[in-house]
Amino acid sequence: MEHTLPALPYAMDALAPHISRETLEYHYGKHHQTYVTKLNNLIKGTEFENATLEEIVKKSSGGIFNNSAQVWNHTFYWNGMKPDGGGVPTGALADGINKKWGSFEDFKKAFSASCVGNFGSGWTWLVKKADGSLDIVNTSNAATPLSGADKPLLTCDVWEHAYYIDYRNARAKYVESFWGLVNWDFVAKNYA
């Protein structure tokens, strides 16, 4: 099965001023597209040729895993943001956050510190553990909770290509701006 670049759930300039159109043109239009193209080339003639993206992520390794996971991670990241996002979660998700961190502000500080402290290229995730509790997990490179027992709820891409055009080497400024985009409805649906 040929995998395609999923459409963004908003216009290329819709995340400005937090994330510029130029960043999306490179990050989505070039980086994400390249992962899709490489994945399609790598799976030809393999057991993964007709597999779904999630099946490939869960069962593959090496280059096939790296590219499939990056396609999945990026799609998840785009869906976790929206124009005029931000604010605070409500309902069961807010309760889960308060149970683990005491308050949304304390969660936000912990998640931001994890993003900024995630060495090198990778992802910072809010995940739901098997016991229903929440946690913050850092992964390196293409690694994703999808291939393990944790259920991903939200992610922040901390690869430099996610923020370098807009924020240069100021990852902390990018992370602070990310909070103005979070799509809490998407996160809550993942939590349910």
Please provide the spans of the model-predicted regions.
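Feature for soluble, non-membrane regions of globular proteins
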Residues: 1-192
